[in-house]
């Protein structure tokens, strides 16, 4: 049976009062944060002007107790409104104005150093925009995603300017001199990510180098996107470090990739090289059935974590004797690494823990992949390397000690 009830269009009044998405999503916490942010910024700028004039607002002379404090002669003349967008959202602030006397008897308008002329966004807001773009979101989607937070104040030109700033910082970081870096140790490792090349999803390698300063502080030295971990690829990375002034390191920690070890021998022959003990442990397990994994791990750890060089050597020989009889592939795999698996014993025992593995880079790789796991493919090889750097430079990924 056909219904005779006809749907009528909403009247003009009803249409105007119809609720819109997010209209009733008022958050008193967010509102309070913006109010406090506005108050803090205005107080910061007023304090800056007070310091320049050596007197607070509404006082003609210098503040009591500051009579001898040098200050610039001048006078305030009201304020002007400024719009500012931060990670807290958009706010309106009142920026104080002042005229300052100059040496030639004229006056000039005071300019705040805290809030630069024409500044419309905080650095945190720019970092948020850049992060969205670096993560593979195009300009249109960045604007759409951030329109609610920034009250629609993110235009195409804004995204483009922020992107150019990130690209400029990235280029400067890649070209910076390393001549004054007191690097004594290098940790080198690569990881595989998926990027779009010629409209196809392709696997590439990100080759990462961390430097360890004499005081133990770690610093990211290089990250390059390459087609793989070949000798030529790693040689490109090492040659670039040398070109930028990096001094010959005293110790190297690697994952065991043949291409890397060959490249190292070509540029830094004679420098002690430590094969990552964690990578070698994985290699051993890959050569044995699962039923032997627990026993292999116990014997391996007993050897690697022995307290003295003598104990390590004794347990190494015992490991090889036992596993040559029980499962020869295990003994052969350990012998393949040779003395490079135990190069850490050349260092003081207090440094053994940090010198045995490439864990410092492995943790960065894990955190980076966790950040991009929702994206099956990154936009390009260059963007992949830049995103790794940007996440670390912005503090979104932290390097452990």
Q: Each predicted region: which residue ranges?
A:
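Short, conserved DNA-binding cores of transcription-related domains
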Residues: 2-6, 12-108, 112-115
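Conserved phosphate/pyrophosphate-binding and hydrolysis machinery centered on Walker-type P-loop NTPases
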Residues: 34-38, 119, 135, 152-156, ...
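Short, amphipathic alpha-helical "recognition" segments used to contact nucleic acids or chromatin
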Residues: 124-136
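DNA-recognition alpha helix
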Residues: 140-151
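Acidic/histidine-rich catalytic cores and adjacent linkers
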Residues: 1-24, 47, 51, 55, ...
């Amino acid at each position: 049976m056909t219904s005779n009830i006809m749907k009528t269009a909403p009247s003009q009044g009803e249409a105007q009062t119809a609720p819109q998405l997010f209209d009733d999503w008022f958050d008193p916490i967010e509102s309070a944060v913006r109010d406090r942010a506005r108050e803090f910024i205005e107080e910061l700028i007023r304090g800056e002007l007070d310091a320049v004039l050596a007197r607070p607002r509404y006082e003609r002379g210098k503040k009591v107790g500051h009579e001898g404090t040098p200050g610039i002669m001048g006078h305030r003349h009201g304020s002007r409104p400024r719009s500012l967008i931060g990670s807290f959202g958009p706010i309106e602030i009142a920026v104080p104005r002042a005229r300052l006397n100059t040496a030639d008897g004229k006056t000039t308008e005071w300019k705040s150093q805290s809030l630069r002329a024409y500044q419309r966004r905080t650095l945190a807001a720019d970092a948020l925009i850049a992060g969205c773009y670096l993560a593979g979101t195009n300009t249109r989607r960045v604007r759409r995603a951030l329109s609610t937070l920034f009250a629609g104040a993110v235009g195409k030109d804004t995204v483009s300017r922020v992107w150019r700033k990130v690209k400029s910082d990235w280029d400067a970081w890649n070209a910076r001199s390393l001549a004054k870096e007191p690097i004594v140790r290098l940790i080198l490792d690569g990881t595989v990510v998926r990027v779009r090349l010629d409209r196809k999803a392709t696997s590439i390698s990100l080759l990462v180098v961390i430097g360890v300063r004499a005081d133990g502080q770690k610093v990211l030295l290089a990250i390059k996107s390459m087609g793989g971990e070949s000798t030529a690829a790693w040689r490109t990375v090492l040659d670039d470090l040398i070109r930028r002034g990096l001094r010959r390191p005293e110790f190297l920690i690697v994952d065991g990739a043949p291409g890397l070890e060959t490249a190292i021998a070509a540029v830094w022959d004679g420098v002690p090289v430590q094969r990552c003990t964690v990578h070698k442990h994985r290699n051993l397990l890959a050569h044995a059935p699962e039923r032997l994994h627990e026993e292999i791990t116990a014997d391996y750890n007993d050897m690697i974590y022995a307290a003295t060089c003598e104990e390590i050597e004794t347990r190494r020989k015992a490991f090889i004797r036992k596993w040559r009889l029980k499962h020869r592939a295990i003994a052969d795999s350990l012998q393949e690494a040779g003395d490079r698996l135990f190069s850490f014993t050349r260092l003081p025992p207090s440094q053994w823990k940090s010198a045995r593995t490439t864990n410092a880079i492995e943790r960065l790789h894990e955190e980076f992949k966790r950040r991009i796991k929702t994206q099956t493919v990154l936009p390009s090889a260059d963007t992949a390397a830049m995103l790794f750097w940007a996440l670390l430079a912005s503090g979104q990924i932290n390097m452990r000690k």
